[in-house]
Amino acid sequence: MKLKKMLALTMAAVLAAGLTACGSSADTSAAPAAESTAAAADAAGAPDGDGDPTTLTVAMECAYAPYNWTQSDDSNGAVEVRGSSDYAYGYDVMMAKKIGEALGQKVQIVKLDWDSLIPAVMSGDVDCVIAGQSITAERAAQVDFSDPYYYASIITLTKKDSQYASAASVADLAGATATSQLGTIWYDNCLPQIPDANILPAQETAPSMLVALNSGACDIVVTDRPTGQAALVAYPDFTLLDFGGGDNDFQVSDEDINIGISMKKGNTALKNAINEVLATMTADDYNTMMDEAISVQPLSE
């Protein structure tokens, strides 16, 4: 979580602030587990969007660091973007590769706008979406979700010299000029909780949201912890405000912070196969992966 509002993981969060993953730790029976997962993939009929049963087609924005981004080469294990000379990497790509390996499939990345992700998986053009999606009831009515592959708490970003830099609660943000990304929990659910906030139009992408803050167009932006932690690398003048998840924080449900992999309704075999992979991972695994993603993300993201 972008825990954005509207299936393949392999990284995790630098700050999982008290949030724990529900996957069980891996045991020593790796080969049997891999065989079981591969069998589930076979049973799924490998319903790839391109009709190739050897390929797992995964959609993402490729513009949402540290979850996913675009780069010009295959450094760090990046995967080529379908129909492009560019490559994609990040936490989501790492997870996609981990799942693809377990299923015995090559990963193909499809770059799409945020609002096109759910329609693409519903139509069968792609097998799954791994893009920092929150597992919301609204989305679950349209697609099936895996178990969470990350848990992302909500934070606020502002500049170090801002009047809001010492804020210790949502109430302390009163009167702030604020924005966030279009179609996200952050914009739709969190910003309205700020007393007397001057809420600007939503930004199309996470990078444009950060640019708005950096340029002085707004006082604060609300986002998730991985996005905020990554932003501190690219924008050293920013500071991250974490209100601790209690009464002083933004009031959100578990679904708002559980990040899952979406797939077409009824694709139970693929869902089960992905969940088998996730069940071998722990919260520490997720956090280690996210730390790695943040450490290698392009500063422009």
Residue ranges and their predicted role:
Residues S116, G132-Q142, N189-P192, S215, ...:
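A ligand-binding cleft/hinge motif common to bilobed small-molecule-binding domains
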Residues E101, K106-D172, V252:
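Acidic, polar ligand-binding/catalytic clefts
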Residues K5, G18-A34:
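Bacterial lipoprotein signal-peptidase II cleavage site
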Residues A65, S85-E101, Q133, I155-L210, ...:
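Bilobed "Venus flytrap"/periplasmic-binding protein-like clamshell domains
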Residues Y151-T158, A234-L278, V296-E301:
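Periplasmic-binding protein-like
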